[in-house]
Amino acid sequence: YGLVGSEMCIRDRATYKNASLPAEERAGLLLKELTLEEKVSLMMDSSKPVERLGIKPYNWWNEALHGVARAGLATVFPQPIGMAASFSPETVYEVFTAVSDEARAKNAYYTSQESHERYQGLTMWTPTVNIYRDPRWGRGIETYGEDPYLTSRMGVMVVKGLQGTNDGKYDKLHACAKHFAVHSGPEWNRHEFNAENIKPRDLYETYLPPFEALVKEGKVKEVMCAYNRFEGDPCCGSDRLLMQILRDEWGFDGIVLSDCGAIADFYRDYGHKTHPDAESASAAAVLSGTDLECGSSYEALVEAVKQGKIDEKAVDVAVKRLLTARFALGEMDE
């Protein structure tokens, strides 16, 4: 038994199971063990388990707009538009530090019960840093107002409060800047609206500054791409937004995820209809840098690879980012 135990310990130290290795290295080691079908199953909000490798189910969709949402009793703070009226970034930091404490505690409880449902995880799809330009937009209360500077200051503090100081073994939580970009209502046509003829000055002085601040100052771990189109391309398939601006200009190296159903908008009749089917839409989204889908269109990625619409190496890039985040949060460990 001693020899067998020693061999197992040595083997584990050289694999993704070794918790002393950096998260990115562990992700790379685990990636090598996965089949294409298993990789794809990890790329949607309700991530499937891979039992043969000890990967648990995980739900990426969790909410904390002004308190831990939909996960039982929690402290309810004012809506973001109300917190913005305080003009106190320090207060917002304290609020979301408390929110992250509660979220971590709730996750620990649910995990102890072997429950991995939506709203029980560690990846919070908050904050909303879109600009509240038109008071007729019903979801304007989720924003920090009409001013890009104030929105930036508040948003950075939301992220820092949620993600914590990162001085422990694992990250506390991962926050998400949404909805990228040029997304300020109305709701009724967001699945087909095309934001075009946006003047460069308006883009860079109004719509983009909060996201840039959250990436560069806040070190936000996730960015959610919006439903609408930008200059003809769905935001979740926009090379301009997701590759040129977000990753190349700003240096973002985290996860890009879609709003819920946004990939299906690429091809369904009441959406953008920029792509003929789920295979083409999913391939385009991943190639543009959308790592994670809230929805189920990414199931078509297996067939898309077989059809030559996308190389499996592009899938690997996305999956490695997802696994790195899960290791960094400690979610993959006991």
Per-range role (PLM):
Residues 1-3:
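A short, hydrophobic C-terminal helix/tail in secreted or cell-surface proteins
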Residues 6-7, 11-334:
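Glycoside hydrolase catalytic-domain context in secreted enzymes
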